[in-house]
Amino acid sequence: MMTTLTARPEAITFDPQQSALIVVDMQNAYATPGGYLDLAGFDVSTTRPVIANIQTAVTAARAAGMLIIWFQNGWDEQYVEAGGPGSPNFHKSNALKTMRKQPQLQGKLLAKGSWDYQLVDELVPQPGDIVLPKPRYSGFFNTPLDSILRSRGIRHLVFTSIATNVCVESTLRDGFFLEYFGVVLEDATHQAGPEFVQKAALFNIETFFGWVSDVETFCDALSPTSFARIA
């Protein structure tokens, strides 16, 4: 059954049961003091409201029959998957650079099995959800995401999480090039960097690559009364 989500720059109509909520990298690394972003000098002090909003969005999406996909960014504990000096990721990843500057952190940041890699305590995948590891910013790169979505007839993706200007935007952009409709819930996302990069990322998304809405509006669009209005 179709519903219409009020969004910028215009409303978008979608079928929740042929859509997915994407929770990108809600790991201790990105949202918890003592995690990678915090240790690398980024401000994570305002992530708690974002976590609460993601909980709300996940609950509403699950009740409406949307697929929930959780991403965890990181690599094996030897960082082979991160790429060596021949990879730009080796040179640009702030996690890898932080560990080179602080050798005592080696093996602790974004390593599979570590506390840093784990999802935050408040967000727990449920049976029927899909949890995917990813080795780079985009959730489409070297993962089965595209085939998972296509095999289920899913064309609409609703994005939450951290960081808006890095992994969220990278995944949404790649989805745009693969003919997916991407929506970001702005109050369920958080940037890596100053506030202006959040605004810049959202501007890019709503102007060039997708749509921007918020959690309250999203939940309202998934309510039974909204389906009744469309019907």
Curated annotation (Swiss-Prot):
Its EC number is 3.5.1.110. The keyword Hydrolase applies. It is an enzyme of class 3 (hydrolase). The active site is at 25 (proton acceptor), 134, 167 (nucleophile). InterPro entries: Isochorismatase-like_dom, Isochorismatase-like_hydrls, Isochorismatase-like_sf, RutB. GO terms for biological process: nitrogen utilization; uracil catabolic process. One of its GO terms (molecular function) is hydrolase activity, acting on carbon-nitrogen (but not peptide) bonds, in linear amides. Induction: Up-regulated by the nitrogen regulatory protein C (NtrC also called GlnG) and repressed by RutR. The keyword Transmembrane helix does not apply. It catalyses: (Z)-3-ureidoacrylate + H2O + H(+) = (Z)-3-aminoacrylate + NH4(+) + CO2; (Z)-3-ureidoacrylate + H2O = (Z)-3-aminoacrylate + carbamate + H(+); (Z)-2-methylureidoacrylate + H2O + H(+) = (Z)-2-methylaminoacrylate + NH4(+) + CO2. Pfam families: Isochorismatase. Keywords: Hydrolase. PANTHER family: ISOCHORISMATASE-LIKE DOMAIN-CONTAINING PROTEIN, PEROXYUREIDOACRYLATE/UREIDOACRYLATE AMIDOHYDROLASE-RELATED. Belongs to the isochorismatase family. RutB subfamily. Hydrolyzes ureidoacrylate to form aminoacrylate and carbamate. The carbamate hydrolyzes spontaneously, thereby releasing one of the nitrogen atoms of the pyrimidine ring as ammonia and one of its carbon atoms as CO2. NCBIfam families: RutB. This is Ureidoacrylate amidohydrolase RutB. It comes from Escherichia coli O157:H7 (strain EC4115 / EHEC).
